[in-house]
Regions:
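Left-handed beta-helix
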Residues: 9, 17-141
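Conserved nucleotide-sugar donor-binding
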Residues: 3-13
Length: 141
């Protein structure tokens, strides 16, 4: 698990050599192949928060951890741990007086008229009156 930086010739060589084996996992196949073939490998041990989000359940779990900073250690308001993202171009979010929102994160461009519990709504999501979103990550446009 991690972030990998390769020169294109080295990566292409490894992938082409492993293609017939259906061996595409970097940690299990590509890195050992590179080591066995004399490529120089370097590592940096990172002790902060990091999660492999290579599966849909893992991506959902990582998003849910944002909603539970006491247990995950994630603090979105930490000045030393800035999160940079592309501006969505959306207006601010709107939460109607009839809406019920608890333990959730609502991003720009969302319109909430229904119920949202323990969920994350990304830009442009609309929750109509009477609708219930619970324990969910909903990605908009």
């Amino acid at each position: 698990m991690g972030i990998y930086i390769f020169s294109w010739p080295a990566l292409k060589e490894a992938l082409m050599s492993l293609k017939d084996q259906n061996s595409c996992d970097f940690g299990k196949h590509v890195l050992p192949y590179c080591k066995e073939n004399g490529e120089r490998l370097f590592a940096y041990e990172y002790n902060g928060y990091w999660k492999d989000v290579g599966t849909i359940p893992a991506l959902w779990e990582a998003n849910m951890e944002v909603l539970d900073p006491e247990h995950s250690g994630i603090n979105l308001f930490d000045e030393n741990w800035k999160i940079y993202s592309r501006n969505s171009g959306h207006t601010g979010h709107f939460i109607s007086n009839s809406a019920e929102v608890t333990d959730s994160m609502i991003t720009d461009g969302c319109v909430v008229k229904g119920t949202v519990k323990h969920s994350i709504l990304f830009g442009g999501v609309v929750v109509e009156e009477g609708a219930v979103v619970e324990d969910a990550v909903v990605m908009g446009d």
